[in-house]
Amino acid sequence: MKALHFGAGNIGRGFIGKLLADAGIELTFADVNQTVLDALNARHSYQVHVVGENEQVDTVSGVNAVSSIGDEVVDLIAEVDLVTTAVGPVVLERIAPAIAKGLAQRKAQGTERPLNIIACENMVRGTTQLKGHVFNALAEEHKAWVEAHIGFVDSAVDRIVPPSASATHDPLEVTVETFSEWIVDKTQFKGALPTIPGMELTDNLMAFVERKLFTLNTGHAITAYLGKLAGHQTIRDAILDEKIRAVVQGAMEESGAVLIKRYAFDPQKHAAYIQKILGRFENPYLKDDVERVGRQPLRKLSAGDRLIKPLLGTLEYGLPHRNLVKGIAAAMHFRSEDDPQAQELAALIADKGPQAALAQISGLDAASDVVAEAVNDYNAEK
């Protein structure tokens, strides 16, 4: 089996690429970072530090790399059995034209073998969004063939992969936590279902997507925003602050109540899942910076993302949301010189005031009680 993976960054190498290579799949990475491409093609291997209670170093071998812009990547799309991505939500649109070209070439070659495409991004139904971008780039005459032969498979991914702090300055070395979860929608595959250790198949993906979004992502973001306000450097420092931990756990319990109501999750099992997530935030081997986790606050405050979506669930079911609102207020305070969205957020609040700014970003009603509550919390933190 051959696979092409877009994104040779830390998540690509340390999570999805590693699982594919470990499964004996012939793997090629596609990226724009020439340093990483050259290193992969020189060595065809790299090291992954898996950190936790039992630390280990795994070697991933037998990998190749191509530029994600150019003919080579198009040729590969025309011949592989699986395409995966870990490029970040905003980059999906940029790789879609190359995928569209590769699919057109696949059709022209008369390849009837199915191809499945899986976007492994921190977003809800990312592959469905990628499919939209690919279809925008496809000529009309290819669309029916692509619909029949190409599976666009949504997934939920979960593994904390902080930026590498390699002592050797090796551009390929990567550190990951022990925990990983890759859940895919088995109803969307074309052809036989693949057997890849570490890939879990489900016919109820949205329950797992929202469980991860409402727990790991919600908790991670609120820890980062409260941590930044309190002057903490890392997620671990922040979650060990008892005041912050109380709000983060409270917010995850509030979002969890939505999940329990919506998907009939077992309350005790979900409480244990929350504790597992808190334990991951405390991992002393992950130097996860609050500024990195907090970046792109406009996206994280949008209606379908980790702060507002669980809040909307609490409003839908008439459930408490006090701690979620505290997290939203903290997100509005996020400032970073290195993040254009943080600067845009600050400018929007300065121009329109917190009430109108939050309503515009989140889609919440500016006159609603919940926006007033968030603005009160925001002003109290000034």
Curated annotation (Swiss-Prot):
Family classification: Belongs to the mannitol dehydrogenase family.
InterPro entries the record matches: 6-PGluconate_DH-like_C_sf (IPR008927), 6PGD_dom2 (IPR013328), Mannitol_1_phos_5_DH (IPR023028), Mannitol_DH (IPR000669), Mannitol_DH_C (IPR013118), Mannitol_DH_CS (IPR023027), Mannitol_DH_N (IPR013131), NAD(P)-bd_dom_sf (IPR036291)
Alphabetical UniProt keywords: NAD, Oxidoreductase
A molecular function (GO) term: mannitol-1-phosphate 5-dehydrogenase activity
PROSITE patterns listed in its UniProt record: MANNITOL_DHGENASE (PS00974)
Name of the featured protein: Mannitol-1-phosphate 5-dehydrogenase
Family matches, as NCBIfam families: PRK02318.1-2, PRK02318.1-3, PRK02318.1-4, PRK02318.2-2, PRK02318.2-5
Catalyzed chemical reaction(s): D-mannitol 1-phosphate + NAD(+) = beta-D-fructose 6-phosphate + NADH + H(+)
Enzyme Commission code: 1.1.1.17
Signal peptide start-end: none
An example Gene Ontology biological process: mannitol catabolic process
Intrachain disulfide bonds: none
Positions of NAD(+) binding: 3-14
Recorded GO CC terms: cytosol
Pfam families to which the protein is assigned, alphabetical: Mannitol_dh (PF01232), Mannitol_dh_C (PF08125)
Highest taxon of the lineage: Bacteria
